Amino acid sequence: MTAATAGIDDVKRINDWLDGAHPSDAIRWAVENVTPGRLIVASSFGPTGMVNLHLLAQIAPQVPVAFVDTLYHFPETLAHAERVKAHYGLDVRVYRPAASREAFEEMHGERLWERDLDLFHRLTRVEPMKRALQGVEGWITGRRRDQSDSRVALAHVELGDRIKINPLTAWPSEDVWSFIRANDVPYNPLHDLGYQSLGDQPLTTPVSEEEHERAGRWRGTERLECGIHGLT
């Protein structure tokens, strides 16, 4: 199945089925229905992404994993990414906006996010993700309904230019962490320090128990998304 051949009725039927299924079923469905070689997993190695990767390693370890290294991640995030690659042996492909932070800042200046946040995210996140999606028919993400108000109606399968699969959309954070602990899934140590959703180091803060897990991203602004998931 491709985005060109899938219909609205197909997607509704699949979503109805996945509402009562395990996330592994969504990953198997993607592997079996997207053209071989044209499916990827997009991951920044957050908690939900780690559940996806744990399941992927069991179901279809040949599927590539696309990681956007913005050049501004926490050092702990980059170290965690290396541990994950070694732990699961997955085909992790890294996409960057430039060869190094120094090269990026030579082109665009320092602290671009303070001058133009939209441009900063377009250059460091959206453009690298566009490259990762070239030739891709389907991509698996780690988005969930309870992550923020902007995701409360998120379906398991979305139809756009490509098919987007969100295996854990219905899982609350508690279920994600229960799975991580029960299966010894590696996770970023910053989560133990109150960081729930990890983005760029200059733009990310810890959150309180009362807040959405993405409340620490772009604190003090009304922004909820970086722009990657505007890509379909």
Per-region residue spans from a language model:
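Nucleotide-activated chemistry modules centered on ATP-dependent adenylation/adenylyltransferase
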Residues: M1-T232
